[in-house]
From Swiss-Prot:
It is found in: Cytoplasm; Cell projection. Its main location: cytoplasm. Belongs to the TDA2 family. The keyword Transmembrane does not apply. It comes from Zygosaccharomyces rouxii (strain ATCC 2623 / CBS 732 / NBRC 1130 / NCYC 568 / NRRL Y-229). This is Topoisomerase I damage affected protein 2. InterPro entries: Tctex-1-like_sf. One of its GO terms (cellular component) is cell projection. Keywords: Cell projection, Cytoplasm.
Length: 119
């Protein structure tokens, strides 16, 4: 199952969309390998890396988790919704959604949202 992420606003992203995707995926993969892949640790690691990339922005990271309790995620038997609203300058601020794959088939999906706001 894939999350629908058509609402991205990445045209003004401080990090290119492909690099942001890789940052999220590699951070999660590294945490999984070290046995420390908690949502809290993922948030902390992502924010540290984003802050070191550019001091011209403030970053907000949101992680929505979907657990089905089964090894496969069946899009007909689960629902997740997450809404984020903001008042910002659309020329400088934006957001990006990334669907972390369930590589180990544990029935857990994470949707990571990165928001940047110009200082």
């Amino acid at each position: 199952m894939n999350f629908e992420t058509g609402q991205d606003k990445t045209s003004n992203a401080p990090i290119p969309k492909d690099k942001l995707s890789e940052l999220i995926k590699s951070t999660y993969d590294n945490l999984e390998r070290s046995g420390n892949a908690s949502v809290d640790q993922l948030l902390k690691s992502l924010l540290e890396q984003l802050n070191s990339h550019s001091s011209l922005y403030k970053y907000i990271v949101s992680i929505s988790t979907l657990e089905t309790g089964s090894e496969t995620i069946d899009s007909e038997n689960c629902t997740m919704s997450n809404a984020i609203g903001a008042s910002w300058n659309s020329r400088k601020d934006g957001l990006f959604n990334y669907d972390l794959p369930d590589n180990e088939h544990r029935g857990v999906k994470h949707l990571v949202t990165v928001i940047w706001v110009a200082k």
